[in-house]
């Protein structure tokens, strides 16, 4: 009787052990399962795209680049057209300004020519002719002044190759070397620009 009771107790203990083994998974087991699922998910996400997908992606990128290139080309063409129009407009304005400037000079010189003709037509004496020529000279000088044309100072000045051209040299007592001692032809400025240098003789 005692042996039967002992066997029963042993079987109950074994069943208890089995029941314990079949209980809920431990935290370690749960963590391992989560890690395995995460790895499987990442592997699926990192799956290499197919050839068709690669081709489609490249086609889309190519279309985008072609669209950008067309936009840049349109911009470049518009800028070129605007620049061409600007260049033509400025060239026309420049030509008109030159033409207008020439016209103004001619208009200012016409009275000088008129007075020359009157002086030449005058059959009076030499003094009258001289007075007429002096009048014309003063009138012509006023025209030059109006257009900011000035004589270049030369005689008594030191030679300056930017304003003077030396045609001759001569030893002159009391004169410094390269001092201008004679002017063969006057030079002129237009504003601050030398439009004709003076032709001079300088001392040695």
Swiss-Prot record:
Keyword Protein transport: no
CDD domains tied to this protein: GrpE
Superkingdom of the source species: Bacteria
Protein name, entry field: Protein GrpE
Presence of the UniProt keyword rRNA-binding in the record: no
Keywords: Chaperone, Cytoplasm, Stress response
PANTHER family per the UniProt record, alphabetical: GRPE PROTEIN, GRPE PROTEIN HOMOLOG, MITOCHONDRIAL
Biased composition (Basic and acidic residues): 1-21, 36-46
Single Gene Ontology MF annotation: protein-folding chaperone binding
Region feature Disordered, mapped onto this chain: 1-46
Record note on quaternary structure: Homodimer.
HAMAP family, per the entry: GrpE
Primary localization class, coarse: cytoplasm
Family statement drawn from the similarity comment of this UniProt entry: Belongs to the GrpE family.
Function noted in UniProt: Participates actively in the response to hyperosmotic and heat shock by preventing the aggregation of stress-denatured proteins, in association with DnaK and GrpE. It is the nucleotide exchange factor for DnaK and may function as a thermosensor. Unfolded proteins bind initially to DnaJ; upon interaction with the DnaJ-bound protein, DnaK hydrolyzes its bound ATP, resulting in the formation of a stable complex. GrpE releases ADP from DnaK; ATP binding to DnaK triggers the release of the substrate protein, thus completing the reaction cycle.
One GO-annotated biological process of the protein: protein folding
Localization (cell): Cytoplasm
Gene Ontology CC terms: cytoplasm
UniProt gene name: grpE
